[in-house]
Amino acid sequence: MNRKVILNKKQIENIIKRLSFEILERNLSINEICLIGLEKNGYTIAKRIEKFISENSTKKIFTIQLKYTNRNFKLSKEIEKKQKNVILIDDVLKSGKTIIYAIKFLLDYNMKKLRTLVLIDRSHNEFPVGLDFTGMKLSTTLEEHITVNLGKEESAYLN
């Protein structure tokens, strides 16, 4: 398999740190933020952002996992009524289909704000998804695939 590393562990750490600072800067007057990570990598990114923000501010921050299979979504725990500032997080945005269905699901909750964050935006949107926070924008062909590994050998690669 021919694969090209596009982000190494240090680069991923730096992007997550920068995204965390952006979240803090854009939410100066907000005391509580709810991070909702799409299962697996989106949730892992959300937990890392939560850790960074907790260590660097006094904001209350909560992380919830959003599990999904075939357009069926389920939160790992309910969003409390007072948690109205939500950031939906995923690792890679390709067509926007997963995020648009997740947004549709989350609109049933009473939120003041819903923002989106991705580690890598592939620029192949087929759905009208606006991103509020983007780690990296990378134009690829439709045949190429980006894989993000946030495990032991952390990297993002193109194949």
Regions found by a protein language model. Give the residues of each.
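Short, well-ordered alpha-helices that flank and scaffold nucleotide-derived cofactor binding pockets
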Residues: 21, 25, 47, 51-55, ...
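Residues at the starts of beta-strands that form the adenosine-phosphate
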Residues: 32, 60-62, 85, 113-116
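PRPP-dependent phosphoribosyltransferase catalytic core
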Residues: 26, 104-159
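Active-site-facing substrate-recognition patch
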Residues: 1-30
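Short glycine-rich phosphate-binding loop at a beta-alpha junction
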Residues: 28-39
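Internal catalytic or translocation cores that form aromatic/hydrophobic pockets or channels
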Residues: 84-107, 111-113
